């Protein structure tokens, strides 16, 4: 093999060959971006997650579907359109989905997200037009158009995803993976048991968890450790531009809200799911079977993770049941149990700053 100096002499001696080599290197295909459908209820942290997705070359956002949750379906659609317009991405279809959860009344969260859902920041009117397709139908169409290539990244209640599965179960084996923000195996943030996205439509969440596809749950165990601090805010404020300034404003609102409650920073809930879609090595996962509690008086919306992998086998004998052993329970989810918070936060800041 030629030394480096020898290679340089060879290239100088044969400039035509050097040109061919350069052309070949430039023509080499780049690593394919991961195709994602971003399902969202924007929402402040949804806004942060969307901007992270749009600023990550590893991701190819094929569609944005809007679900009610943090805000109403109508407000969420308007927010999504204004954000893609701000980012100059009118090429991405934005579609309205469900108007309400499957069975219960909607619970919105202006207290945490501002009156308009975007930290009370008034973005310019959108230059983008809404896609006329129903969100779950758009999800189904895109999955069939790119079988085994689409990753679903829902960061709100799972109503749209559940409706798509119920309408066309054949999409399940055609989805590459589902990376969702929601749930917790260590306690909730709405109450002692439930996380907000799951709580806002437990029946939909149970459908999604039991569908049978590759699923990663990015829950409170990640977001509660990845806290966006005043230091991160200062770093973000070093550069300016329409997207950067908007994200700075949202984070300033959230950090201020966190400080009111004595926290050192604002949890990066929804951006964490996007970050995991970009780089799965950010988190540590544990495979387990997850069910969603849909009936409990105090636990409705809880994601119940079976970390042991088995359940007691009870057999009826006369007037009582007798435990006769254990039955294995197959895992249906990879549950994120830990995160490299510093690396996740630096990814977020650097991507928004365009570095």
Label each region the model flagged.
Residues 17-25:
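Cleavable N-terminal signal peptides of Sec/SRP-targeted secreted and luminal proteins
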Residues 33-36, 77-145, 328-339, 344, ...:
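Metal-dependent C-N hydrolase catalytic cores
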């Amino acid at each position: 093999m030629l030394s480096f100096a020898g290679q340089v002499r060879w290239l100088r001696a044969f400039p035509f060959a050097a040109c061919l080599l350069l052309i070949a290197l430039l023509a080499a295909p780049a690593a394919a971006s991961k195709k994602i459908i971003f399902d969202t209820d924007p929402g402040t942290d949804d806004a942060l997650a969307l901007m992270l997705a749009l600023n990550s070359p590893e991701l190819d956002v094929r569609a944005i579907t809007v679900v009610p949750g943090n805000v109403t379906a109508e407000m969420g659609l308007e927010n999504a359109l204004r954000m893609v317009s701000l980012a100059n991405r009118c090429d991405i279809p934005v579609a309205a989905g469900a108007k309400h959860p499957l069975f219960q009344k909607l619970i919105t969260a202006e207290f945490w997200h501002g009156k308009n859902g975007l930290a009370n920041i008034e973005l310019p009117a959108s230059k983008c037009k809404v896609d006329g397709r129903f969100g779950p139908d758009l999800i189904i169409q895109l999955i069939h158009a790119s079988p085994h290539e689409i990753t679903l990244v829902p960061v709100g209640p799972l109503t749209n995803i559940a409706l798509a599965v119920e309408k066309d179960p054949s999409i399940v084996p055609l989805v590459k993976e589902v990376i969702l923000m929601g749930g917790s195996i260590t306690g909730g943030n709405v109450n002692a048991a439930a996380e907000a996205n799951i709580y806002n439509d437990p029946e939909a969440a149970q459908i999604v968890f039991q569908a049978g596809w590759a699923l990663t749950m990015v829950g409170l165990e990640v977001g509660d450790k990845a806290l966006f601090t005043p230091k991160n805010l200062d770093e973000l404020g070093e550069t300016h531009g329409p997207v950067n300034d908007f994200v700075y404003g949202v984070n300033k609102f959230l950090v201020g809200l966190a400080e009111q409650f004595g926290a050192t920073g604002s949890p990066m809930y929804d951006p964490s799911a996007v970050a995991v879609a970009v780089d799965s090595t950010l988190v540590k996962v544990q495979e387990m079977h997850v069910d969603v509690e849909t009936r409990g008086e105090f636990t409705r919306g809880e994601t119940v993770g079976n970390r042991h992998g088995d359940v007691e086998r009870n057999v009826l004998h006369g007037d009582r049941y007798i435990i006769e052993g254990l039955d294995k329970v197959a895992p249906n989810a990879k549950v994120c149990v830990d995160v490299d918070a510093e690396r996740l936060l630096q990814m977020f800041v650097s991507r928004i700053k365009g570095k």
